[in-house]
Amino acid sequence: MSGRGFLLLALLLLVTVEATKVEKKHSGFLLAWSGPRNRFVRFGRRDMQSPLLSERLRL
């Protein structure tokens, strides 16, 4: 895996985990934080709607 691809994956994972943490307080947090990066918004929404994936990321 290239360094850039790994960095992007790590950033995506971090954003997803952070979004899961604040999900109950700020449901639109990831959407507002991402701005023009629609890819992150899509992944974040899908992860938020999937309790199993969210639990797996927390472990």
Curated annotation (Swiss-Prot):
Residues 32-39 are annotated as: Positively charged region crucial for activity against MRGPRX1 receptors. Disulfide bonds: none annotated. The mature peptide does not contain cysteine residue. Residues 1-19 form the signal peptide. Its main location: secreted. It comes from the Eukaryota. Belongs to the FARP (FMRFamide related peptide) family. It is found in: Secreted. Expressed by the venom duct. The modification Phenylalanine amide is found at F43. This peptide activates human and mouse sensory neuron-specific G-protein coupled receptors MRGPRX1. The activity on human receptors has been measured (EC(50)=1.8 uM). Compared with the agonist chloroquine (anti-malaria drug), it is 200-fold more potent. The peptide also causes an increase in cytosolic calcium in a specific subset of DRG neurons, and, in contrast to other Conus venom peptides, the peptide also affects a large fraction of the non-neuronal cells. One of its GO terms (molecular function) is toxin activity. Keywords: Amidation, Cleavage on pair of basic residues, G-protein coupled receptor impairing toxin, Neurotoxin, Secreted, Signal, Toxin. Residues 20-25, 45-59 form a propeptide. This is Conorfamide-Vc1. The lineage of its organism: Eukaryota, Metazoa, Spiralia, Lophotrochozoa, Mollusca. GO terms for cellular component: extracellular region.
